[in-house]
């Protein structure tokens, strides 16, 4: 029995947990938009009910597919909005809509806590399970972001089946009726309720007493279950039409979507049934409807078998049966919606608390993640061209998540069978785990020291870095390009030129222009050629057919633009000598033989590369939607090597090569194992995104480098604090702040990293306090001072200093101008509505489903192709996701180490903000997160008990990744290859980069 002190601590802990659960849901509700279709319905229904009353609500022709049970709550929201003059688009409207479901979610959390305390004891297992329920991705998203009412619908059913667990049948039936009055979806749980009441009759027959009372309970339960439905419908339909109107409403609602699955990522979706008509089917002789009905019969028969077997064995559990049945129906039945899984997940978590079984917890964990991905996918695509999930990437997500959801259900089903029929329990409470490091909440002992660097290891690091650099710099770009432009920005310049031979082609190499043009006239004043010069044309060669006779004087007119070079070629492709031409024809040696990515900009190089040139030459910069530090580095490369393909890409490629030794050092420090660091560095060397993203003159490589550098310094700081204290850890603290500032000044994604760094910074301070060392107050003051100085003041100064090129161009550039730059950046990214054929949502990044197509060389001979795409090594991407999920599972099941928690925090800090972004996004936005996914791979191997086996697995993984790197190298580098090789890389229908 728990002591009075333990009970008080338990109540205090529960209050904190419930406060966190409510706060996070309501904050999400305030700062996110709800699902547009549901929001418009809920607000309109509430306003109509508040204005016209219940009797006039279900008017003819008015769309309202919900039964009356929850409508009074929406009406109350309408009254509050009207009284307080809250607009429909106001965040407070979303707050009000989410308030009741959030409170119901909290009640569900409290129920899990209560059941866990009874069957799991007061240990960490109950706390872990309850905290997972608090931050369950599915319920958080459903209530806080989507703003649905599933929490209010699920709570009475959760209480219903808990009361049935306690053999309190009649109150349970009443609560079932409450849920049925809210949503017809409660009918899915009806067979479980029936089985539970029949089990009561079976108990009476077996005990040979109270049979009549048990049968009476069945009929009483039916009446109590119908009572809330009738009571809720009475104000809306009146006595006369009550039953016919309710029947019509429930029948219409349940039959309103005749599709195999309505965005529910289940078994039917895995078979390709999303939005497929019920008359169609996976096989010519089998329709979706027939398959669904057969599956319902099978699941129901299995329910009866489980119920009978468990009843005979004395392990009859309504909670477990309800979890099995509701999730089973969602998985294998037709006409399922995406949110129907919410109830099932909560029932699984309650069952895990009731039976203290880690397999049930694992099933709930898997189902919550698949359900979250399901909701997030549908939510993020609403209003887009892919709203019905018909694109290749969306179909692949649907199928993969559908298979994953099915696998999670199978785990649930096998566990339910093991518990009900065999009595096999795998307790969660034992998961405090042998060999696992204690969490931050426990007193921390001094960490082991870092292993010394050997000469052999240094040599290996140097060789790997050199090899990476050699491969990265090979065929990076031409080292020659025209450097002397005809500059007509803000004016018009005219140049005459006379070719010595008949011309067949004209090659043009423009420079900076924002709305200029190039026109060429013959001697008679006829326009022979015209090209608009704008943001998309700088530093990129183009060619066109151009017929001009030998000796004919041509006049070129350049208006409001730079043009670096023109070239005329004859029918054989040879350059034609000319007379005149001035700066337009003065660098024939810099004209390339062919046009390719080696001598021309592609993708966002036309923004960032040109801005580096503008900074160097003190021109007004074009690209101002990101901080300037990354473009400062591009400028340095141009200053050293000239405005050439090699010059504008040099700095990024250098940083990409240096990313490999940085990853080596990061994982080495994290694991304290040299072999792990070497493996991490080698894996990153063959990663696709590191290679392709470092060879394009954009800024993501710089932000990613400094984010990883900041993470390295923070890990160093955390390890040092636990041994040397805060005062002995000022060097990593300071260096970490500098790295953080450099990351923020490169791209605002560096700011995302600050959230993860802050959690680690405060977490290790708490761990230091738990060590009970003397003088902690002084350490705390130093940590507070250092945090402000090195993670606020220093980063701000670095960020501000990155704007020095602006000041060089214009000495009057001041604080107000700097602030205007920041507000413009925020406005640009928050209001951007542009679309792109290769944009992708964050959930597709996890499985590398939609590469960014950067470049296509269209001037190659028939039978060959050349292309450049940005994506990840599929081997590393898949392994990284698996290891991230494994680390996450270890943490939520009390089996994780602090190192795993740190990697997860750093990973989540980069990924979570993108989940809230609704504008156009690309796969390369996952680049910083992928660094920690790769670290997770090696960390999981390093934490294995058999180091020899871990090394072998690592080598196999490296070999597989290397094979993929060689295979896909042409698609990463632009190397021209035969069609067969190029086509072989299209391993998914969503790839399409040739």
Give, region by region, the residue ranges found by the protein language model.
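Transmembrane helical bundles and short interhelical boundary loops of multi-pass, membrane-embedded
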Residues: 216, 241, 246-262, 287, ...
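Perimembrane helix-loop-helix junctions
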Residues: 189-227, 238-239, 343, 713-723, ...
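Short acidic/glycine- and proline-prone juxtamembrane loop motifs at membrane-interface regions
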Residues: 144-152, 337, 648, 652, ...
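Transmembrane-helix signature of polytopic, membrane-embedded enzymes
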Residues: 86-92, 107, 112-138, 312-318, ...
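Aromatic/glycine/proline-enriched transmembrane-helix motif characteristic
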Residues: 29, 205, 249-331, 417-420, ...
């Amino acid at each position: 029995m728990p002591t009075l002190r333990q009970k008080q601590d338990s109540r205090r802990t529960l209050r904190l947990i419930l406060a966190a659960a409510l706060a996070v849901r309501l904050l999400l509700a305030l700062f996110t938009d709800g699902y547009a279709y549901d929001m418009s319905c809920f607000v309109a229904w509430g306003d109509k009910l508040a204005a016209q009353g219940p009797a006039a609500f279900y008017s003819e022709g008015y769309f309202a597919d919900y039964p009356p049970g929850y409508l009074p709550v929406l009406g109350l929201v309408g009254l509050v909005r009207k009284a307080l003059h809250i607009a429909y688009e106001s965040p407070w409207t979303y707050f009000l809509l989410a308030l009741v479901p959030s409170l119901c979610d909290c009640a569900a959390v409290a129920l899990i806590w209560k059941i866990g305390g009874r069957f799991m004891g007061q240990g960490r297992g109950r706390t872990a399970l309850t905290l997972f329920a608090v931050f369950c991705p599915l319920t958080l998203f459903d209530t806080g972001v989507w703003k649905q009412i599933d929490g209010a619908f699920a709570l009475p059913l959760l209480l219903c089946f808990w009361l049935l667990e306690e053999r309190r049948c009649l109150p349970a039936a009443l609560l079932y009726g409450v849920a049925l009055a809210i949503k017809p979806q409660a009918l899915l749980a009806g067979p479980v309720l029936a089985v539970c009441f029949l089990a009561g009759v079976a108990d009476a027959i077996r005990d040979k007493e109270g049979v009549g009372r048990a049968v009476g309970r069945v009929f009483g339960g039916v009446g109590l279950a119908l009572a809330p439905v009738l009571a809720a419908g009475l104000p809306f339909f009146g006595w006369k039409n009550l039953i016919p109107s309710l029947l019509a409403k429930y029948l219409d609602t349940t039959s309103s979507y005749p599709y195999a699955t309505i965005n529910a990522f289940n078994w039917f979706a895995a078979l390709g049934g999303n939005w497929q008509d019920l008359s169609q089917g996976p096989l010519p002789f089998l329709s979706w409807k027939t398959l669904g009905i057969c599956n319902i019969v099978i699941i129901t028969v299995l329910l009866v078998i489980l119920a009978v077997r468990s009843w005979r064995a004395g392990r009859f559990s309504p909670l477990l049966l309800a979890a099995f049945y509701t999730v089973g129906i969602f998985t294998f039945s037709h006409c399922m919606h995406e949110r129907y899984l919410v109830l099932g997940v909560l029932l699984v978590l309650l069952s895990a608390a009731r039976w203290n079984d880690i397999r049930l917890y694992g099933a709930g964990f898997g189902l919550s993640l698949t359900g979250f991905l399901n909701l997030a996918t549908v939510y993020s695509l609403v209003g887009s061209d892919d709203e019905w999930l018909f694109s290749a990437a969306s179909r692949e997500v649907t199928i993969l998540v559908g298979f994953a959801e099915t696998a999670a259900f199978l785990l649930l089903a096998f566990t339910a069978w093991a518990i009900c029929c065999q009595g096999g329990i795998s307790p969660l409470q034992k998961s405090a785990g042998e060999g696992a490091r204690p969490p931050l909440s426990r007193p921390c002992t001094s960490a082991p020291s870092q292993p010394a660097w050997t000469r052999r290891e240094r040599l290996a690091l140097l060789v790997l870095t050199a090899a990476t650099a050699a491969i990265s710099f090979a065929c990076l770009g031409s080292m020659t390009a025209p450097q002397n432009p005809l500059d007509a920005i803000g004016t018009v310049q005219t140049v005459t030129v006379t070719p010595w031979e008949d011309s067949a082609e004209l090659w043009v190499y423009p420079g900076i222009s924002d709305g200029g043009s190039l026109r060429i006239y013959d001697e008679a004043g006829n326009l022979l050629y015209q090209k608009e010069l704008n943001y998309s044309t700088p530093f990129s060669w183009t060619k066109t057919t151009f017929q001009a006779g030998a000796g004919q004087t041509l006049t070129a007119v350049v208006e409001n633009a730079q043009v670096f070079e023109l070239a005329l070629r004859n029918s054989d492709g040879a350059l034609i000598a000319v007379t005149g031409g001035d700066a337009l024809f003065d660098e024939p040696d810099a004209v390339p033989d062919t046009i390719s990515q080696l001598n021309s900009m592609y993708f966002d190089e036309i923004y960032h590369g040109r801005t580096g040139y503008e900074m160097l030459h003190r021109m007004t910069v074009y690209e101002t939607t990101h901080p300037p530090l990354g473009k400062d580095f591009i400028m340095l490369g141009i200053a050293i090597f000239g405005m050439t393909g090699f010059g504008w890409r040099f700095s990024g490629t250098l940083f990409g090569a240096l990313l490999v030794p940085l990853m080596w050092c990061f994982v080495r420090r994290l694991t304290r194992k040299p072999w792990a660091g070497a493996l991490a560095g080698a894996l990153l060397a063959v990663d696709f995104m590191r290679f392709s993203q470092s060879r394009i003159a954009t800024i993501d490589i710089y932000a990613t480098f400094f984010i990883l550098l900041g993470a390295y310094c923070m890990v160093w700081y955390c390890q040092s604090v636990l041994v040397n204290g805060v005062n002995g850890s000022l060097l990593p603290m300071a260096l970490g702040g500098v790295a953080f500032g450099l990351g923020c000044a490169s791209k605002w994604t560096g700011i995302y990293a600050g959230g993860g760094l802050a959690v680690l910074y405060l977490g290790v301070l708490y761990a230091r306090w738990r060590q009970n060392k003397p003088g902690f107050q002084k350490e705390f003051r130093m940590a507070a001072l250092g945090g402000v100085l090195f993670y606020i003041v220093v980063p701000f100064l670095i960020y501000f200093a990155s704007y020095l090129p602006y000041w060089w161009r214009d000495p009057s550039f001041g604080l107000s101008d700097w602030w205007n730059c920041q507000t413009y950046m925020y406005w640009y990214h928050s209001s951007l509505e542009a679309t792109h054929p290769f944009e992708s949502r964050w959930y597709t990044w996890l499985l590398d489903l939609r590469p960014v197509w950067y470049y296509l060389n269209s001037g190659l001979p028939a039978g060959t192709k050349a292309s450049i795409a940005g994506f990840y090594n599929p081997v590393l991407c898949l392994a990284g996701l698996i290891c991230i999920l494994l680390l996450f599972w270890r943490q939520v099941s009390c089996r994780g180490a602090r190192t795993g928690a740190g990697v997860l925090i750093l990973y989540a800090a980069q990924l979570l903000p993108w989940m809230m972004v609704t504008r156009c996004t690309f796969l390369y936005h996952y680049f910083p997160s992928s660094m920690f996914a790769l670290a997770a791979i090696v960390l999981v191997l390093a934490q294995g008990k058999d180091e020899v086996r871990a090394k072998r697995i690592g080598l196999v993984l490296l070999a597989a990744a290397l094979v993929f790197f060689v295979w896909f190298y042409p698609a990463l580098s632009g190397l021209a290859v035969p069609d067969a090789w190029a086509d072989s890389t299209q391993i998914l229908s969503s790839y399409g980069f040739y």
